[in-house]
Amino acid sequence: MEGGARTPEDLETLLEDAFVLRSGEAMAELFENCAVLVAEATREVHGQEEIVRLARQMWQRNRSYLAEPRRIVQAGNTALIMTQHGANVVRRGPDGAWRYAIALLSQDHIPPRRTNGAAGESP
């Protein structure tokens, strides 16, 4: 991730990209060291290492992420990103890049990943 996310919207797009590419390295760069991710119903993990571990488990089940911010409220270096099925708190670091501090991704917000349009698979 060259230079990181320059806006909260960019951060959402980069998270979607990390899911599509299934890149643990890219995923880790999007979260603060002590970040919290809540996904897969009520599963809560803390820190970059645990977040990457959970993401890899989600990828094994062909889960993806769709960036669809509905509203962004920003106060200085902190922003709240509201999506249809979740909410994320993000902060701009000293390097100017935005990172997730808290990410709440509901089960509905994590669609199964399409795999070559095989019959019987849902989008």
What are these regions (language model features)?
Residues 1-26, 36-123:
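A beta-strand edge to alpha-helix "cap/lid" segment located at domain peripheries
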